[in-house]
Amino acid sequence: MEKKQLKFIDLFAGIGGMRIPFEELGGKCVFSSEIDKHCQRTYEANFGEMPTGDITKLSADSIPYHDLLLAGFPCQAFSQGGRKQGFQDERGQLFFQVAKILNDHRPQAILLENVKGLRGHDKGRTLQMILYVLEKLNYVVSWKIISATDFNLPQKRERIFIVGFQDKNNKNLIFDFPKPIELTAKVGDLLEKEVDEKYTITDRMWEGHQNRKKAHRKRGNGFGFSLVNRNSSYTRTISARYYKDGSEVLVEQANKNPRVLTPRECARLQGFPESFVIPVSDCQAWRQFGNSVPVSVIRAIAQKMLSYIDLTEQQKEFKKVDLDQVITQKKKQLYPEDYQEQFIQKELALL
């Protein structure tokens, strides 16, 4: 049977960091979704299409056939920098929108990305819920925490990657994640040679950074700015709040205050190509690259995933599951005390 072109969809697409490697490898994006208007602008500037907006308003028939689903579902609900509310946060609930699309379409493969904090969030119960739902949708799932430094990007950025394949004939296929490669790139390789003076921080800002770092050190945490130079092996994680939370990566400069990274340098630290267009303000660009994925890591995973996907296969009939029932069953197992309290309240109401 003739091999067909890989078709994939790009959900919570951001600025397309997950899309780039799969297109490089011959895949075709047949649908994209991103609600942020500034990200939409960057996405359109680079891929020539405006992503669909609110994923919660999508109908099953509005999404075309696809072999692969990509989703970097919102991480703020699980991250160290956020409030860590998980599924109690509306953004955490958006994973279930992904599950709904999987239930409607059952693509052969999935690739999900989130912050490292997802692993231990709510004592591991959040990840347990995600894996349980995917398994009930007949996916054999593997996950791993990978740093951008593992694939030659000089940024210490650890993220969790969840890969799943439809379980055919109960083979229980286990995905073999790509092996790390040697970090040969240095921060200096990615820094611009000439930088506008506007990126140098003021005396007041520099004093504020130093005072905040001292305060964080007294409290025993690792927040606060970090200084790098051209010889540094890597930077810390660039965050979506790069321009306002005091945890900036700052670049040393001779005989003057340090400077912030330029948007192009942030793009390079995330592995975006030089041809990638940045049509938005610096503040929006910092936010977008801070929220994005390390493209080199996605590329390595994509190369592995393609060897597991059968592009000669025709989609088979499948039976949809009752997602509400699946989720409720797992919640009862993970949070028995909550359901016991609800039962008591119902009994008291009958008295």
From Swiss-Prot:
Alphabetized Pfam families for the sequence: DNA_methylase
Enzyme class: transferase
SAM-dependent MTase C5-type domain mapped to chain residues: 6-312
Record keywords: DNA-binding, Methyltransferase, Restriction system, S-adenosyl-L-methionine, Transferase
Gene Ontology biological process: DNA restriction-modification system; methylation
Keyword Glycoprotein listed: no
One function term, GO molecular function aspect: DNA binding
Keyword S-adenosyl-L-methionine: yes
The organism's place on the tree of life at top rank: Bacteria
SUPFAM superfamilies: S-adenosyl-L-methionine-dependent methyltransferases (SSF53335)
EC number of the protein: 2.1.1.37
Active-site feature positions: C75
Annotated InterPro entries: C5-MTase, C5_DNA_meth_AS, C5_MeTfrase, C5_meth_CS, SAM-dependent_MTases_sf
Catalytic activity, as annotated: a 2'-deoxycytidine in DNA + S-adenosyl-L-methionine = a 5-methyl-2'-deoxycytidine in DNA + S-adenosyl-L-homocysteine + H(+)
Family: Belongs to the class I-like SAM-binding methyltransferase superfamily. C5-methyltransferase family.
PANTHER family: TRNA (CYTOSINE(38)-C(5))-METHYLTRANSFERASE
Protein's name in the database: Type II methyltransferase M.DsaV
Naturally occurring in which organism (per UniProt): Dactylococcopsis salina
Higher taxonomy: Bacteria, Bacillati, Cyanobacteriota, Cyanophyceae, Synechococcales
